[in-house]
Amino acid sequence: MVISTVLGRPPSTSDVDCTVKYSIPESDQVRSNILDPSVQIFMIIERVVVEVYSRKRISIRIADYVSRQLKGWASRWLLDLTKLTVEHNGVSRSTVIGACSTLCSYYYGIMLLTRPFLIYEIYEHLGASLRGGGTQNDHRQKRKYADAALDAAASFVETLRAVIDTEIMPRRMPLIVWVIVTPSSTLLLTLSDPGSSRQRLF
């Protein structure tokens, strides 16, 4: 999946064959199976790679569809995983690291989906006319997704920093080290323009 995302190509060396009923959790404690939300979020990321980056196009319709999947995932897992990264009493080191990695994957998935809209907004701000029609509602939706890219980047960094401050994070975390480039570049794109009104978000 990491290689597929880097190349912007569909994962041709894998296939989805899953019979797990994710809507019926076996336990109310997320710490009992941290792999479950991780598998789910990577399946959503796979859809972003296939629907957006392999086809090199994005639309409001596709963004809305994947956004609903991300919201469904968040409603089930986000709060519990966040608690595991900030409340360490009685929680194993591996569980905290797993929760952090899964949360970072979630924010990374949001950034993958919404970054094209942020780039669109930056081009517009720089004076490049890219509007190819569309209603006012379409433009509001694009702005909403652009803002979501920034929010996800900030949340990614905050989540990672909170766990790093506990000094339980291993020095070598290849997945997190690799994906940190995305939120960093997303935030730098915005902050590099002194006149950008989006700086107020930070």
Regions found by a protein language model. Give the residues of each.
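Extended, leucine-rich alpha-helical cores of fungal transcription factors
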Residues: 1-76, 89-202
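Conserved small-domain helix->loop->beta segment predominantly found in fold-type I
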Residues: 81-90
